[in-house]
Structure formats: C-alpha cells, structure tokens
UniProtKB/Swiss-Prot annotation:
Keywords: Plasmid. PROSITE patterns: SIS (PS51464). It holds the Pfam family SIS. Coiled coil: none annotated. One of its GO terms (biological process) is carbohydrate derivative metabolic process. One of its GO terms (molecular function) is carbohydrate derivative binding. It comes from the Bacteria. Residues 28-171 form the SIS domain. This is Agropine synthesis conjugase. InterPro entries: SIS_dom (IPR001347), SIS_dom_sf (IPR046348).
Length: 359
C-alpha cells in the first residue's frame, strides 16, 4: 500500500527506496525521448484510471510549451474504438503512442498494445514489469519494478520522457533541471504527506458518508481530483466525488453551490497558465459566502516544501506534491465513516467489464 497514506509509519529514506529503480532510469528515459522525438510529429498518451490522470496533466503542460508537435491524451477504451474506426491514425511512423498501466493488465490498454503490434507508429510502454501482459507485444518498455509507489513512479518516468521530447523538439531548456528535481521529489512527497495528516483529521471530523465532495482544479492540477478524488476516495470507499475543471465552474456548475447542501469543496490552485481560472473560483467563494456557510478549502500547489526542486519544475510536479499532501486524508476519512483502507471493493475486479456486451 502507498506509503503516503501513513507517513508516520515510514520515512523519506524509505520513500526514496521504493522509487530507487525509477530514479535510476530517469536519464535513460529522457534520452529515449530525445532520440525518438527527432522523427515524430504527434505524441498520443493512452491509459486508464490514474494513468489517464497523469497523461492529461502532462498534456496540459505540453499545451503551454509545445509549438512543433501535437499532443493528445486518450482513455484506452476510446483509443481502441478510434483505431478500429480509423486504423490510419497509428499507421504513421511520425506518431508516438505512449501506453501506461500500473498493473500491466488493464484490458483496454492491453488491447491497444496488441492492436499496435504491427502498426507503423512508434510506441513505448510504462508499467510495473517487463513480463506483464502489456509489455508482451514487443514495444519499448520501461518498468517501475515492484514498488508501493507505482503511481508516482510512472508519473516520474513519463515526465522524463516528455522532458526529453520537449528538449529535442520544443527548445525546452529545463531537462537538466527536471532530472535533478525528480531526484529529490520523493523527499518532497513524503514531507507533504506529513503536512497533510492533521488537516486530514480535521476535515474528516466534519465529513459524513453521504456528503458530496467536489474537487475543483485546472491545468496540470487536474491530476489531483482524478488520482485522489476518483482513484482513491471514490474507488475505495464509494464516496460521492465530483471533479470540476476551473474553466467550467462558472458555466452552470456554480449554481449547485448552496448553503443548504452538505457539500464540501476542495480548490486546487496550480502555478501554471490556468492559475487565473482558479483564482476566480476562489474569489467567488471568498466573496459570496460568510465564514462557515460553505465547507471549502483552498490548496495551493506552491504551498509545500520543494527544497532542491527548480521553481519552473515546481509548476509541473507541484500537483503531485499536493496529491501526496491529501493521501493521509484517505485513512482519516475511512475511519470517520466506519470504513478501512482494506475493505474489499464492491464491483472492481469482480466484473469482467471490457467488451462484455452481446455482439
């Protein structure tokens, strides 16, 4: 289980140890990105669940700095459907498809990898093991090894890949800063989790199982509502979680914010081009409601100890550090609602969902 859920039971050294195999590969992955970038025009991220959260966050950053390549992020099932309808989208040697799955067993991602086996596009896989099903189709594979921190490991490897591509094709001069910053990221993640323990306990004290919880974020910070709100709180406990993009907040959603509802709102404010959107949302809550009328909290992705992390890289990894800050909230919320971190899932892993419909 992720060490960040209970930072008091571990240490920054243990955190780094769990990510050792990843840290050792950062430069190799970046080098692969640089070498591959010279002959591509498109980068297509393909994943599901937390991997898709990573992909979308990276795309938000490439949208800001990219000029010469096209970057897209697809849910694996959507990508498979598109390939079936239009196989030519991957029969192009100037396209790089980036596949990721922590387990290496996600069925729609595995099917995408199988479909790509004999296609002209370039491909790369990020997963736990080179022996996984996802890695069995001959694609270049980078593996995290056995680790409690698979989510962070895959994010770090994929970010290194993108750093190499941006360096080669987008005149991005921050690759050395990225690699050095990622080397110290495990310590920053651990410190953020330590910082999150008491706020998590305080939040859990006013939370109930039937309270809706809204995560509002923008830009690269969109990874936080998806990875923590959906992939942890909703998946493990069945809580009613809603994720809202800051750009959409004032278009209908704002009307759901009412004092009579027992809802909670967590605002994640990034340090990227989308920051003004979230500052507008924060201003709405500050100006429209008196203290205590609405349960809302503001978390700045810049509000954590980032010792050794380049400030410009902090804009990219800040959301991951913010997600680490929230991780200890999960066991606190579980205890407050009579659940545990080890409760079995109700449906996931028990229903063979992919392509289960009648032909």
């Amino acid at each position: 289980m992720d060490l960040l859920y209970a930072p008091s039971s571990t240490s920054a050294i243990e955190m780094s140890g769990q990510l050792r195999a990843t840290l050792q590969q950062l430069e190799t992955v970046a080098k692969f990105g640089r070498a591959t970038a010279s002959s591509i025009s498109s980068v297509l991220f393909v994943s599901a669940g937390a991997g898709l959260a990573i992909a979308r966050s990276l795309k938000r950053y490439t949208d800001q700095v990219g000029r010469n390549l096209r970057y897209e992020a697809y849910a694996s099932a959507t990508f498979v459907n598109l390939m079936r309808a239009n196989p030519s989208m991957v029969n192009d040697p100037t396209t790089l498809v980036v596949l990721s799955s922590k387990s290496g067993m996600t069925p729609e991602t595995v099917e995408a990898a199988a479909f790509l086996k004999d296609k002209a596009c370039k491909s790369v896989v990020f997963t736990a093991s080179a022996n996984s099903k996802l890695a069995s189709f001959g694609h270049q594979t980078f593996s995290t090894g056995i680790t409690t921190q698979a989510f962070q490991a895959i994010h770090m490897l994929m970010l290194s890949l993108i750093g190499g591509i941006l360096n080669e094709r987008e005149n991005w001069a921050l690759l050395p800063a990225l690699i050095s910053s990622l080397q110290v990221l495990p310590a920053a993640l651990f410190k953020a989790a330590e910082k999150g323990v008491q706020p998590g306990i305080a939040f859990a004290a006013r939370f109930a199982d039937d309270h809706p919880l809204y995560f509002i974020a923008s830009g690269c910070a969109g990874i936080v509502p998806h990875a923590f709100g959906l992939c942890v709180l909703q998946e493990r406990f069945g809580f009613e979680i809603h994720t809202v993009d800051g750009a959409d907040f004032f278009h209908s959603f704002v009307e759901t914010v009412r004092t009579a509802k027992r809802s909670h709102y967590i605002l994640i404010i990034p340090d990227d081009a989308s920051r003004p959107q979230m500052l507008d949302v924060k201003t709405f809550f500050d100006m429209r409601f008196k203290e205590g009328e609405i349960s809302f909290q503001v978390i700045e992705t810049t509000g954590f100890d980032m010792s050794g992390i380049d400030p410009q890289i902090g804009a990219i990894v800040g959301p991951m550090i913010c997600e680490a800050f929230l991780k200890p909230w999960a066991p606190a919320l579980a205890e407050a609602t009579g659940k545990t971190m080890l409760d079995p899932l109700l449906h996931m892993g028990k229903f063979d969902y992919y392509n289960c419909h009648p032909a």
